[in-house]
């Protein structure tokens, strides 16, 4: 069998006047993530991990932040398109593991919604998708609440 591991990373600044969307879940908060699309840091990290595992480049190669057609894009749509491309290349997803690092807001109440969205978008049972919420223990730009970071790992199997 041909197994492929992919690793993804993303970070966005928190700013006033934007919704906070993580894992496809809109989270009540006074600030949101700055980005060309909806800036869903978690879905961007997972998308990057999927493209990386399939040796298909990264999210920017497929969905450029300089392309006007992706302005304000729903990252769930981008994740589904990534999944279609990875599947067309002959891969299936074994599992997804991810971490979101945010000093605030508390993400634990939203984790199951994130898992459900990701599982639905990738055609997986929810037990094959994991999302962890972490703080940065008040250290650095994440600890000061200046942004939110996500990391993801995926395992692909060639069909």
Curated annotation (Swiss-Prot):
NCBIfam families assigned: ispF (TIGR00151)
Origin species: Paraburkholderia xenovorans (strain LB400)
Cofactor note: Binds 1 divalent metal cation per subunit.
Its biological purpose: Involved in the biosynthesis of isopentenyl diphosphate (IPP) and dimethylallyl diphosphate (DMAPP), two major building blocks of isoprenoid compounds. Catalyzes the conversion of 4-diphosphocytidyl-2-C-methyl-D-erythritol 2-phosphate (CDP-ME2P) to 2-C-methyl-D-erythritol 2,4-cyclodiphosphate (ME-CPP) with a corresponding release of cytidine 5-monophosphate (CMP).
Top-level taxon of origin: Bacteria
One Pfam family this sequence matches: YgbB
Keywords recorded for this protein, A-Z: Isoprene biosynthesis, Lyase, Metal-binding
Protein name, entry field: 2-C-methyl-D-erythritol 2,4-cyclodiphosphate synthase
Pathway: Isoprenoid biosynthesis; isopentenyl diphosphate biosynthesis via DXP pathway; isopentenyl diphosphate from 1-deoxy-D-xylulose 5-phosphate: step 4/6
Residues involved in a divalent metal cation binding: 10, 12, 44
Self-association and partners: Homotrimer.
Top EC class of this enzyme: lyase
UniProt cross-references to PANTHER family, sorted A to Z: 2-C-METHYL-D-ERYTHRITOL 2,4-CYCLODIPHOSPHATE SYNTHASE, CHLOROPLASTIC
GO BP, one annotated term: terpenoid biosynthetic process
Cofactor: a divalent metal cation
E.C. numbers: 4.6.1.12
Alphabetized HAMAP family for the sequence: IspF
Residues the record lists as binding 4-CDP-2-C-methyl-D-erythritol 2-phosphate: 10-12, 36-37, 58-60, 63-67, 144
